[in-house]
Amino acid sequence: MSIENLKEALPEYAKDLKLNLGTVARGTVLSQSQLWGTLVATAAATRNEQVFKEIREEAAGILTPEALDAALGAASIMAMTNVFYRGRGFLDGAYDDLRPGLRMNIIGNPGVDKSEFELWSFAVSTINGCHYCVGSHEKVLREAGLTREQVLEALKIAAIVAGVAQALATVPALV
């Protein structure tokens, strides 16, 4: 189970994704923990079992158990908060004065460096399409000292993983 397995499973029409996935997994401007946490969190966010399984199994040999749990926690909590804040945004401010009333304790105590958790949350929020959360997480990341290049790299990883998941979802229908 690995990135290589995902690359091999991609059809020819997804060759660009195959190349991009290989490039980003070999190393980036992110630390190994930032990179693999972003890969795990975004793989979980795609809801594609094959993509998640392959990435998670390789990441388990790189990330600490705490970082692996935190990456999955980022995907889970963002699944909830992205829907809430994106949905509230559709209501033109009519509900902005009300408390969400949602537990989000993992955001304050993720079990890993908070900037890593924010990076993973940012990447998942891009997949989930919540521009409020994307903007909020980007601001926190920049204030924490991450560079524009690091933030953009997480965005790029999210885009690649989402593309890989979409391409692999079509393969069974082609046979």
Swiss-Prot record:
Catalytic activity, as annotated = N(6)-[(R)-dihydrolipoyl]-L-lysyl-[lipoyl-carrier protein] + a hydroperoxide = N(6)-[(R)-lipoyl]-L-lysyl-[lipoyl-carrier protein] + an alcohol + H2O
Supply the enzyme class, top level. oxidoreductase
NCBIfam families under this entry? ahpD, ahpD_dom
What are the catalytic residues?
Answer: 130 (proton donor), 133 (cysteine sulfenic acid (-soh) intermediate)
Binding partners and assembly = Homotrimer.
Q: Which residues cross the membrane?
A: none
Q: Record's family?
A: Belongs to the AhpD family.
| Keyword Disulfide bond appears in the UniProt entry | yes
Q: What is this protein called?
A: Alkyl hydroperoxide reductase AhpD
Which cysteines in this chain are paired by disulphide bridges? 130-133
- Show the GO MF annotations: alkyl hydroperoxide reductase activity; disulfide oxidoreductase activity; hydroperoxide reductase activity; peroxiredoxin activity
What InterPro entries does this protein map onto? AhpD, AhpD-like, AhpD_core, CMD-like
Q: Among its keywords, does the record have Acetylation?
A: no
Q: What does this protein do?
A: Antioxidant protein with alkyl hydroperoxidase activity. Required for the reduction of the AhpC active site cysteine residues and for the regeneration of the AhpC enzyme activity.
